[in-house]
Amino acid sequence: MASAARGESSNPYGGGLGTGGKFRKPTARRSQKTPYDRPTTSVRNAGLGGGDVRGGGWLSKLVDPAQRLITYSAQRLFGSLSRKRLGSGETPLQSPEQQKQLPERGVNQETKVGHKEDVSNLSMKNGLIRMEDTNASVDPPKDGFTDLEKILQGKTFTRSEVDRLTTLLRSKAADSSTMNEEQRNEVGMVVRHPPSHERDRTHPDNGSMNTLVSTPPGSLRTLDECIASPAQLAKAYMGSRPSEVTPSMLGLRGQAGREDSVFLNRTPFPQKSPTMSLVTKPSGQRPLENGFVTPRSRGRSAVYSMARTPYSRPQSSVKIGSLFQASPSKWEESLPSGSRQGFQSGLKRRSSVLDNDIGSVGPVRRIRQKSNLSSRSLALPVSESPLSVRANGGEKTTHTSKDSAEDIPGSSFNLVPTKSSEMASKILQQLDKLVSTREKSPSKLSPSMLRGPALKSLQNVEAPKFLGNLPEKKANSPDSSYQKQEISRESVSREVLAQSEKTGDAVDGTSKTGSSKDQDMRGKGVYMPLTNSLEEHPPKKRSFRMSAHEDFLELDDDLGAASTPCEVAEKQNAFEVEKSHISMPIGEKPLTPSEAMPSTSYISNGDASQGTSNGSLETERNKFVAFPIEAVQQSNMASEPTSKFIQGTEKSSISSGKPTSEEKRIPLEEPKKPAAVFPNISFSPPATGLLNQNSGASADIKLEKTSSTAFGVSEAWAKPTESKKTFSNSASGAESSTSAAPTLNGSIFSAGANAVTPPPSNGSLTSSPSFPPSISNIPSDNSVGDMPSTVQSFAATHNSSSIFGKLPTSNDSNSQSTSASPLSSTSPFKFGQPAAPFSAPAVSESSGQISKETEVKNATFGNTSTFKFGGMASADQSTGIVFGAKSAENKSRPGFVFGSSSVVGGSTLNPSTAAASAPESSGSLIFGVTSSSTPGTETSKISASSAATNTGNSVFGTSSFAFTSSGSSMVGGVSASTGSSVFGFNAVSSASATSSQSQASNLFGAGNAQTGNTGSGTTTSTQSIPFQFGSSPSAPSFGLSGNSSLASNSSPFGFSKSEPAVFTSVSTPQLSSTNSSASSSSTMSSPLFGTSWQAPNSSPNSGPVFSSSFTTSSTPTTFSFGGSSAATVSSTTTPIFGASTNNTPSPSPIFGFGSTPPTTPQQPVFGNSGTPSQSLFGNSTPGFAFGAPNNGNGINNNQQVSMEDSMAEDTDQANRASMVAPMFGQAAVSMPQPNFAFGGGAATQPPSMANPFQFGGQPMASTLQNASPFQASQSLEFQGGGSFSLGSTGGGDKSGRRIFKAKKSTRKK
């Protein structure tokens, strides 16, 4: 047995494990396969080869049967005897040279440092009492068994342990002749330390414990250090392929921290042959604490170091393994302590694995990191950090230099050639220059599609595009690193931010020379430092990156000055830079510092704006023009530039923040400026400041004609002028005199070409307020002659912007003093292409005369009379577009137009003389389609608001802007406040000198903007009610004097029309006519679901369809599904299915369940003339004709009964003219009796008809106030028990509640 065992041990691979019986075991023990299994033949050949050295190959074939017998018997019967027999044959310990050649399976799974005891421990398979010499070249000295005996004496193996060891060893079986360090590295699994007492007992004094430290690099120490897990091997293999990953795929996405930490330390390592070791073998450092070298993150949870793609973190010696030495911890050890500290601080936002660019081929999610934090804190010297780099098994200490850091000719990073990138950038730039505005593709990616960090990252990404043609400089100092570039870029951005604050600093004493110097300083001094800082950029051209620069304070989300990044980006693009070869022709004259630059993020194409002979600017290109919004100029700025065309030349006059009646205009010559391209839509405080109406501030923002198309759709110009747009939040104060008319046709998502007439050469552009960054733009050329600032009423130009629709183009006509801007309204979701040029008359405030008839020309696709799906219909005065039906009446306009917006030309109403009754104003259409009904009313874009006197709300309209073309101008005249749209993105209320206040509440009552107009001073109160179901109207502005009429219009789904129309919420002809300045009337129409209250108005209110708004004179009641009780001075129409008590002559609702009857003749339901004839369903004088205007008293139901105390709560008793009978109601009775209406209001006027659905109600002989909603009215319904009305509102007193208690007693009777 001893000789057999010795023979077996002399041939470990051939007979013992490989050939004899191990692979011939039963399948139950062979079932466990691993990727490291070797063929049986190879093991057999290895055994034979080993036998040739030791002479034991033949013995393995002979003892195979005996081996099986010994295997089982030793385990079961002869365990103790086996240990004793080991002592008979003792082999000496193997020398380090022998250990160097230990095959893989000789390495015990329990060894961490490769002791011979572990090899012997593994070699004892199944408790077999034999010693395996682990290498064929090792002679069997007699000390080997002593070693094994000591191990076996210290430990007894159970069968389960033996089986486990057998399985492990079988999985590790390999060809001893082909075994090398590579295979050792591959096969090395997670190694367990043997018990310390066993190690000490095994090698007490032979010094073999120190062999690991003293062995040369090729020794077992290298094996142990480089033991890799299977996952690491797979990753190393994937990373070893030379042309696999490019820098863009490696996740080198421009994070400064990663680039500073990695690329400043990389050196041109030679390409290694594919046959070299897959896992790097560091030589000079201490061994790892654990046996595996899988990269791990420091200080972060394991989630951040998890593989985000199947092949992430490709770490290999070919790519970056030689630099990072298979582990970030080992690489950090080679760094100086200061560098390591900075490096770790730079990596605190992300794992070291990702930040070292070891992995993340394709990130699934974007991790926000503070790039500048890592770049600033990274104290890694470029040329002073010796990295212990081992290439090809040797130890090299290479000092990385700046040259090698930026240009790595021999590295495996397949960098994009610099020349090709430069050439590509130049070609793109030339193409951008050549492309004209008319030829832009509508599918361009515009920054308007981006928000927040993505838009900011786009700005940073564009820098190589403009600076890509700059030669890469190889600096000798680390200052030229990308870290420095980021810092300098940030500093330059702050510098520009500081200088952009000087934009409005120029005052009347500004001279051309001073402005020239200042502008040169801005054009060169600001942009050039940025250029210099970006000259030495990393060698790779980065792709579009979405990383948010959290440390860029000026680019952060809570941006203090929204215009700053825009101006910075613009100045980078709009000015010619000497070192970047982007040729951007500029006019001979430098830009004035007061110039309002468009807030364009990047001008991707060089623009040469050519000045035409008439002083208009020809924009040759307008690429990526989407929402071209100027940098927000707040109206309270020190000075706001206004551009004026004086004698055909473009001048900019600077109006101080406190304009006087006589404002001096200092013309400063301006160069031809490129069109605003790549506009930023910044919703920062200045942008949101649009809601802040600065009354005294001048709205003098230079606005130039711009076609803004959402998706790059360029708009055709009759005479294209430069695209400049300010989004200034300055609703004009009463005093703003100078103004620049915005000549902007902004179409949002509009694919149509807009024909905007060039500004006439005769005068300065009048100012018109910019609107919130919501989709509204302000298009229209006003040629307003230089009018004295005393004339407060300017023609407030308004945007014609369509959503998904063509823009109506407006041609302004010249007027003697002030020309009303063309009333161009756009309909959202308009797929037609209406370009309706029309000139609006200009009315001076004092004269009140209409300078010119407005002529409205319909666009090609959308005709006035046709219901275009997006067509824009324009009527001469007010035309309702009801499914394409053209109502040519000047007065009423049916509302239900799905996407068409009707533009009403016509003379503008004189703001000062409110006696001139503006025809009814039409409210908003269905989806915010704007319809301007009155001549002199201008509708805002998405939310329909009649500009002259009322504002309508669109359901999804962003903000409704009310502007009368002449009547309510920025400066003076009736300013229509804009109600907020349904989701009320921005409700803008413009305060004007004349006292007219209109409020529109949107469907879900997002924001209500209300303009307070005082006769002397303008006070604007802007109230926004976010997501309120049923917007409550904001209180009238403080200090209303003279004509103070509160007109608010809320349309259920954007419907609003002057006349009640079925399926269209009514729009009261708000401010339609106020006879005297003393007359104060407020009109409110409730939204679809009857949540807003209606305030009484001098003109009739028409209730919305299917809803009723409880309209008391003063207090609103919201969330009322019942009918609306309108205690209004003149007349109010109740909603269709909502009964309301109307104290004034008004049409009754169609299906009003208990509205009070009128005594005056009203139109029948289906459009019959208003005679007190019984209505369609058996009730007299029904209120609604389907789409037909109700002609009540006054001009188209403009009941101009003015009451000073119309806002009082007792307005029910104010004007008791007539009552409206409900549709299904009974005949009228002279006594007022509240209806049994679900929401029906109690009628309080003496002449009234009997209430329908009356349950034994006895008429009261006295006039009673309307009961509050859900309360019994004073009328004797239910025999005095009180009306069961679900929402009638009236002036109702406390007595109604007491009567309601009598209801129970009535039932008992």
Curated annotation (Swiss-Prot):
Bias kind Low complexity: ranges: 728-741, 767-783, 809-827, 1004-1023, 1068-1086, 1096-1105
Leader peptide range in chain numbering: none
Residue stretches of biased makeup (Polar residues): 91-101, 268-283, 597-617, 635-659, 789-803
GO cellular component, one term: nuclear periphery
Biased composition (Basic and acidic residues): 195-204, 396-405, 660-673
Biased composition (Gly residues): 47-58, 1279-1293
Regions crossing the membrane: none
Keyword hit for Transferase: no
Subcellular location: Nucleus envelope; Nucleus, Nuclear pore complex; Cytoplasm, Cytosol
Alphabetically ordered keywords of this record: Cytoplasm, mRNA transport, Nuclear pore complex, Nucleus, Protein transport, Repeat, Translocation, Transport
UniProt keyword Transport, yes or no: yes
Region (Disordered): 1-58, 83-118, 173-210, 266-296, 329-348, 384-417, 467-538, 594-617, 635-680, 719-865, 1004-1028, 1068-1105, 1278-1309
Sequence repeats: 711-712, 804-805, 831-832, 861-862, 869-870, 883-884, 898-899, 927-928, 956-957, 983-984, 1004-1005, 1029-1030, 1038-1039, 1053-1054, 1089-1090, 1121-1122, 1137-1138, 1151-1152, 1153-1154, 1166-1167, 1177-1178, 1186-1187, 1224-1225, 1238-1239, 1255-1256
25 X 2 AA repeats of F-G: annotated span: 2-677
GO biological process: nucleus organization; poly(A)+ mRNA export from nucleus; protein transport
Phenotype of gene-disrupted mutants: Developmental defects, early flowering and altered nuclear morphology. Lethal when homozygous.
Biased composition (Basic residues): 22-32, 1297-1309
Record PANTHER family: NUCLEAR PORE COMPLEX PROTEIN NUP1 (PTHR33416:SF20)
Domain notes: Contains FG repeats mediating the translocation through the NPC by interacting with transport factors.
Quaternary organization: Part of the nuclear pore complex (NPC). The NPC has an eight-fold symmetrical structure comprising a central transport channel and two rings, the cytoplasmic and nuclear rings, to which eight filaments are attached. The cytoplasmic filaments have loose ends, while the nuclear filaments are joined in a distal ring, forming a nuclear basket. NPCs are highly dynamic in configuration and composition, and can be devided in 3 subcomplexes, the NUP62 subcomplex, the NUP107-160 subcomplex and the NUP93 subcomplex, containing approximately 30 different nucleoporin proteins.
Note: Represents a functional homolog of vertebrate Nup153.
Function field: Nucleoporin required for nuclear mRNA export. Functions as an adapter and/or regulator molecule in the periphery of the nuclear pore complex (NPC). May interact with importin proteins and mediate active nucleocytoplasmic transport through the NPC. Involved in regulation of nuclear morphology.
Protein name per its UniProtKB record: Nuclear pore complex protein NUP1
